[in-house]
């Protein structure tokens, strides 16, 4: 059996050629990074959890009409996605002050923001993913005005969906990061949600205690990172109540790609 062709390896995922034209296999690694790759570790089972959580969320978003690259989960670590041309932006939606908005603007961490705030960042690790304006985006042709409008509208819809989903699970959605891509269908092109939505890309706090249940546990050396991710999965109904496995296998064993 011939090995699949690797297209790209990022910090948390590997992309392989898919079985059909226009498809990609997205493999979730156990690697954890922070501070633009300056801090690294391997957290056994993290990739499995992120795969399952992102699948659960992408399916929910698809049901309310938000176009995504997600097609189906293949196994515990992989999912089949549409091939898209990634727009080189990170779109961050903030509901509660935390992270860089607290340090930049002096807003105390944990303060509810006056309204949800959407920010754009240029996706460039070597530059530290700088925050940019819509003027920068259109001036450098990273995206069109229409694509910006589409990303803004979808981000706010995703925020509404996620707030409801996580509140129902006893979790406070502090903020999250999205990425988008261009999906070409013949002569048509549309903006779709890409990448993943997981505790790697969201700040999630327990609704009662404000305990962190996301990647900040790794950034701040708080420990129990995978356990926190597993608790998010359990509350979303993805894992068994015992916390020892997911619907189709044990998340704690770091299943290899099939």
UniProtKB/Swiss-Prot annotation:
Keywords per UniProt: ATP-binding, Ligase, Nucleotide-binding, Purine biosynthesis
GO cellular component, one term: cytosol
Entry's Gene Ontology BP terms: 'de novo' IMP biosynthetic process; cobalamin biosynthetic process
Keyword Nucleotide-binding: yes
Catalytic activity: 5-amino-1-(5-phospho-D-ribosyl)imidazole-4-carboxylate + L-aspartate + ATP = (2S)-2-[5-amino-1-(5-phospho-beta-D-ribosyl)imidazole-4-carboxamido]succinate + ADP + phosphate + 2 H(+)
Keyword Cell division among record annotations: no
SUPFAM superfamilies noted in UniProt: SAICAR synthase-like
EC number: 6.3.2.6
InterPro entries with a match to the protein in the record: SAICAR_synt/ADE2_N, SAICAR_synt_PurC, SAICAR_synth, SAICAR_synthetase, SAICAR_synthetase_CS
Pfam family, one: SAICAR_synt
Protein family membership: Belongs to the SAICAR synthetase family.
Protein name, per record: Phosphoribosylaminoimidazole-succinocarboxamide synthase
Biological classification of the source: Bacteria, Pseudomonadati, Pseudomonadota, Alphaproteobacteria, Maricaulales
Gene behind the chain: purC
């Amino acid at each position: 059996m011939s090995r699949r062709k690797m297209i790209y390896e990022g910090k948390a995922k590997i992309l392989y050629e898919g079985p059909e034209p226009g498809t990609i296999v997205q493999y979730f690694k156990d690697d954890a990074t922070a501070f633009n790759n300056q801090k690294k570790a391997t957290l056994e089972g993290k990739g499995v959890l992120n795969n399952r959580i992102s699948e659960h969320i992408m399916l929910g978003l698809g049901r309310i009409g938000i176009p995504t690259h997600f097609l189906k989960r293949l196994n515990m670590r992989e999912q089949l996605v549409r091939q898209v041309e990634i727009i080189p932006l990170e779109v961050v939606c903030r509901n509660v002050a935390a992270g860089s908005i607290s340090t930049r603007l002096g807003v105390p961490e944990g303060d509810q923001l006056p309204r949800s705030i959407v920010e754009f960042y240029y996706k460039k690790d070597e530059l530290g993913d700088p925050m940019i304006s819509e003027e920068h985006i259109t001036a450098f042709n990273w995206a069109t005005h229409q694509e910006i409008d589409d990303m803004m509208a979808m981000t706010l819809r995703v925020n509404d969906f996620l707030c409801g989903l996580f509140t129902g699970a006893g979790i406070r959605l502090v903020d999250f990061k999205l990425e988008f891509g261009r999906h070409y269908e013949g002569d048509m092109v549309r903006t779709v949600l890409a990448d993943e939505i997981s505790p790697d890309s969201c700040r999630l706090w327990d609704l009662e205690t404000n305990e962190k249940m996301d990647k900040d546990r790794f950034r701040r050396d708080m420990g129990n990172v995978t356990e926190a991710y597993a608790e998010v999965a359990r509350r979303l109904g993805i894992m068994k109540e015992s916390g020892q496995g997911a619907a189709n296998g044990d998340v704690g064993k770091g299943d290899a790609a099939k």
